Amino acid sequence: MRIVFMGTPDFAAASLKKLIDEKYDIAAVFTQPDKPRNRGMQMSFSPVKQLAVDNDIPVYQPTKLRDGSASEIIRSLNPDILVVVAYGRILPDDMLSIAKYGAINVHASLLPKYRGAAPIQWAVLNGDKVTGVSTMYLASEMDTGDVIYTAETEIGEFETSGELFDRLMVMGAELLHKTLTDIEAGTAPRTPQNHADASYITMLDKSLSPIDWSKTPREIVKWVYGLQPWPVATMQLGSDTFKVYAAAYTETETDKAPGSIVSAGKNGIEIACAGGQTVLITELQAPGKKRMKAADYLLGHPIKVED
């Protein structure tokens, strides 16, 4: 099967590597233009481009998709199918029908849930117990195409979005291989999505970082782990903003207002939240300091807890 692969970040690179390892005919790779990625403003390749270059696969990095030139390139490559994984661009309608088998996508949610960007993080942030990956045919509107296969996995109670990302990245690559095998064999299913059940999510940004102590302990814990590795949850101690990397449940009950410190000691910093409950902050990072256990921070910076 001759493939044109379109993708950009690590999540996509895992799928491309799987296709390379399985000896698919990769006619070319399309990826986002090179961007400056450090303080020196040096241009660097996307993970997908680097993998393609390392394997002598032709790379295209169009700045526009709707002027027809990218579509002409794809037609000249005569692919059997377009495979799109976290490319970062919406394909124009004419591009979807160029290849014999159309265009398929790997999406990191159980569609139609979590259409859009950052589905992995929002599954953790929302406290979901199960998530997964889907393969689907691309359609005109984002993430609305017919589903081919899904694969589910449980989310660990204290699993970060980064850890879940790594697992779903591998699952997505495996599911893509199965999908392509069955499409070529003519046995792949095609199930329309129930659009009434669809939900849409947005990109993350730093405005989400401050912890809302009026939430329940579980909501706060999931917020802490869902915002890792970026943008990371934050809390205020005095006038300083601390990054929060780990939190735990407690059995403490309190009549203090949400956000009040209930205790601070060898276990960490216990803070009041919704319903007279508390949550324990066990790992944090002070401004300009390294990440550390909250208990270790308190050894040099004790907190006086008011009654």
Name each region found by the language model.
Residues 36-78:
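N-terminal glycine-/serine-/threonine-rich beta1-alpha1-beta2 phosphate-ribose binding loop
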Residues 1-40:
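N-terminal Rossmann-like dinucleotide-binding module
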Residues 8-11, 63-66, 87-90, 227:
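Short beta->alpha connector loops
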Residues 202-214:
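Acyl-group handling in specialized metabolite and lipid biosynthesis
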Residues 22, 32, 81-200:
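Donor/substrate-binding cores of folate-linked one-carbon enzymes
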Residues 7, 29, 52, 82, ...:
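A residue-level signal for conserved active-site and pocket-lining positions in enzyme catalytic cores
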Residues 214-307:
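An anion-binding loop in the catalytic cleft
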Residues 25, 56-58, 102:
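Conserved beta-strand segments of alpha/beta enzyme cores
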